[in-house]
Amino acid sequence: MNSKYQLPKDGGLVKDFAPKDIIHRYERMATRVFESEYYGVQYVADIICRMVHAHAENASVRDIYEELPPFVLGLATGRTPLGLYRELVKRYQAGEISFKNVAVYSLDEFYPMCGTDHQSRNYRIHDQFLKHVDILPENVHIPDGTISEQEV
């Protein structure tokens, strides 16, 4: 494959030498570094709890809809979110948050794989988080790893 665009051999894109016909931008994403995982988990759990409560109390949303739509929360799997899931479960058990009006979405699932397989993302999210809180089954959205290839 012959391309008119090349990157430096040591990697990365040199801003001043980027071809003018490539759409690109350099963003400075806000980043927070915490002393430990514990403090990072507390920070994120605080935000999620505040947002879920604010959504439930938002009068302007209630004026638009007859029934309050659920708060939408994206979920990841793997080791990274485990501390957060444990903290959210702890806060649910303490009565600090309810997930009854929260809809969760997972972006991916292994294919082909049944949701009850222990390696499945579906299984892990349920086992590590969802089965411990009061989320409604109809508000859980995880791709189905068992659909046929024709349906993919």
Q: Where do the language-model regions lie?
A:
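Conserved residues at beta->alpha junctions
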Residues: E35, L75, R79, D144
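Ligand-binding beta-strand-loop-alpha-helix segment within the catalytic cores
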Residues: K4-L7, G11-R28, I97-V152
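N-terminal glycine-/serine-/threonine-rich phosphate-binding loop
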Residues: M1-L73
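Short, well-ordered amphipathic alpha-helices
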Residues: I48-H53, L82-Q93, H126-F129
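Glycine-rich N-terminal segment of FAD-binding domains in flavoprotein oxidoreductases
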Residues: N58-A94
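Generic structural signal for well-ordered, non-membrane alpha-helical segments
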Residues: E37, V41, A45, P81, ...
